[in-house]
Amino acid sequence: MKIEMICTGEEVLSGQIVDTNAAWAANALMDHGIEMQQRITVGDRLDDLVEVFRQRSEHADVILVNGGLGPTSDDMSSEAMAIAKGEPLVECTLWRERIQEWFTRNGRHMPESNLKQAMLPASAIMVDNPVGTACGFRVKLNRAWLFFTPGVPFEFKKMVTEQFIPFVEQIADSHIEVEVQKLLTIGQGESALADKLEGMPLPDGMTLGYRSFMPYIEIKLFARGEAAIGELDRVKAEVLTRLGDAVVGHNVASLAQVIHNGLLASGKRLSIAESCTGGMIANNLVAFAGSSNYLDQGLVTYSNESKVRVLGVKPATLDDHGAVSIATVEEMAKGARGLLDSDYALATSGIAGPDGGSEAKPVGTVAIALATRQGVYSQMLKFPARSRELVRQLSTAVALDMLRRELQESPVLVDYSSYPRFAR
């Protein structure tokens, strides 16, 4: 089965917004054993939309169309589909009532323009959008089913998950059982990981892939069919053996998720004192509901004065070693932990750039410490200085990994081949 995606919108085509919907959809489909063969982006021009609907419907079996279902003049997907099919737009009474109910329920007057969202090609089959006013629908043209979804990300994701993927699985010629295992890694480049996995035999029906999304590289094992699935645990164990300390999570999207789960399970509490990461560590954790059960505080102690007055860092430590030093982050971590008697505290201080570096401590130099009730672990690393954001992301990842290792009773300090460690 050949599956494609058509993304619509002038702002997407011109690069004014990043098309996160397309990337998310391709990954979600892959997790279900569904591979997308092609993706096309088209602006808000009626003739171009009509042409691409007609053209791609002769080559694909299923086309996921995203965007252009709103109430404004530049939302043209329904009209373009009707023209491509050679049929009129007709009002979907059920959806008109749904829109009216939505506005009434939210205590708002419905603008006349919203009625446009109930106008569908005559042969369209309505696809429910339970969280918005844009009506989804599907239409058969030539060999393809075109499946229309709104551009609003949370509406799109819900419809793809609950409507589109089940539809594709239903019309597929045969359903092959699929299982995916994902291993999250940090600290090694994609080529280094590939070298370690080079020559590892894979059984028929199993593939291995890489996905880089800073600060992580995800290793994905994809098994199709009962025989390949039966070998998945064995192959995964071999990958873990070959990659060793690089693997920091299993079937999770981030290290923060690992820490969240680990702290909830342990009943331990955490404080954070951040300088160069500027609240990024805390932000990663509070994204998860329930983080209040373990997060005592997140402090951004950016200035030397705040390090001294809030965390109790000794002025002499700053004078002798500087703000970016193992001595300073150790005192930051101890001070943060002591404020509320937390079980753990993380601290960061570094040079995120683009300025501020020196020969001894170039841009990308970051000191990180983890304080526990038993003592303090610390290290100073040199991260790639390609951007300020990257330095902060990598610093956050290593800090969280140090805590992960402590929670899992593993050695807290390990070598990351991509991030050289300064001598103490």
Curated annotation (Swiss-Prot):
Alphabetized SMART domains for the sequence: MoCF_biosynth (SM00852)
UniProt record similarity statement: Belongs to the CinA family.
Stored HAMAP family: CinA_B (MF_00226_B)
Name of the protein in its database record: CinA-like protein
